[in-house]
């Protein structure tokens, strides 16, 4: 095996300081200060971990036709674009279908070293979400259903100890018991695609919910100026808050406001990427919507 050592000089992503990184076989050997370099030098940062990836590089993780080969294609494209680890996200469909998809993909992941390294966990986003227009987002409202501990137990038996994020709307019947059971099984529960009132949000937090999925997204274009979901979330609890920072899902003004009100260690960014991301121009699907 080659022991050839390489180095790269650039600016630290957080401090702006000039640094030199020495590495061998993709393993970092040392990081040291460096003299100022070219203005065209790269910014050097850790690779990304994305907690919400629905597909990539022309590959839709929701499709029944998904194969191990096509999943590898998506993983290679994500790695190429700086995201070597992600939570594979499955969106709303019938609960048996969700379980079947995870079970099938998990077999590939558990037996393929590349997939095992890159798929850091699972994000189950639905079908325990709101059916209300706006709050259901791009999800198919016709497949929404109520959670219960038995459904959560079935998920737990498949994922075992894999890191798992479960997004649900806490106003659905059975949610509090399901949040509690999911938390007891080691899952992280995030509230999202919801129009829960303040009391319901507080109850969800007490039951074990710790996060909010892509705040500012999955809500109607027009909100009540006195009482709306964004206000309730900001006024209730200390959520680990996801944001899609693309200037579209959250406006630049709201992006700045959220960063003033939420501690930085309670914010994470996600792309919420779908199959069109990282792909050539063309027609792609997200749920039942063609883009």
Residue ranges and their predicted role:
Residues 54-60, 72-104, 117-130, 159-171, ...:
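Divalent metal-dependent hydrolysis catalytic cores, especially in the metallo-beta-lactamase
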Residues 47-49, 190, 269-270:
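Residue-level marker for buried hydrophobic side chains located in beta-strands
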Residues 124, 129-228:
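Divalent metal-binding pocket/active-site signature
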Residues 94-100, 171-173, 190-195, 244-261, ...:
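Active-site glycine- and acidic-residue-rich loops that bind
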Residues 200-291:
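Active-site-adjacent C-terminal substructures of enzyme catalytic domains
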Residues 106-109, 179-186, 259:
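Surface-exposed amphipathic alpha-helices with a cationic face
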């Amino acid at each position: 095996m080659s022991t050839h050592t390489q180095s790269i000089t650039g600016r630290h992503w957080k401090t702006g300081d000039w640094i030199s990184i020495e590495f061998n076989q993709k393993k970092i050997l040392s990081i040291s200060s460096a003299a100022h370099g070219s203005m065209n030098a790269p910014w050097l940062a850790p690779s990304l971990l994305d907690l919400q990836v629905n597909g990539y590089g022309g590959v839709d993780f929701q499709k029944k036709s998904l194969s191990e080969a096509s999943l590898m294609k998506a993983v290679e494209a994500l790695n190429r674009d700086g995201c070597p680890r992600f939570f594979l996200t499955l969106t709303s469909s019938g609960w048996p279908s969700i379980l079947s998809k995870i079970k099938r993909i998990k077999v590939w992941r558990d037996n393929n070293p590349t997939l095992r390294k890159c798929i850091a966990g699972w994000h189950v986003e639905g079908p325990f979400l709101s059916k209300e227009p706006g709050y259901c987002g791009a999800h198919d409202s016709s497949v929404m259903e109520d959670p219960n501990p038995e459904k959560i137990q079935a998920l737990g038996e498949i994922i075992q100890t894999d890191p798992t994020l479960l997004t649900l709307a806490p106003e659905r019947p059975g949610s509090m018991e399901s949040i509690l059971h999911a938390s007891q099984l080691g899952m992280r529960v995030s509230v999202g695609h919801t129009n829960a009132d303040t009391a319901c949000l507080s109850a969800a937090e007490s039951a074990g919910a710790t996060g909010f999925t892509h705040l500012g997204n999955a809500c109607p274009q027009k909100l009540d100026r006195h009482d709306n979901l964004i206000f309730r979330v900001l006024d209730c609890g200390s959520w680990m808050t996801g944001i899609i920072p693309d200037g579209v899902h959250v406006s630049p003004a709201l992006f700045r406001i959220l960063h003033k009100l939420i501690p930085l260690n309670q914010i994470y960014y996600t792309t919420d990427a779908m199959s069109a991301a990282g792909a050539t121009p063309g027609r792609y699907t997200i749920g039942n919507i063609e883009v």
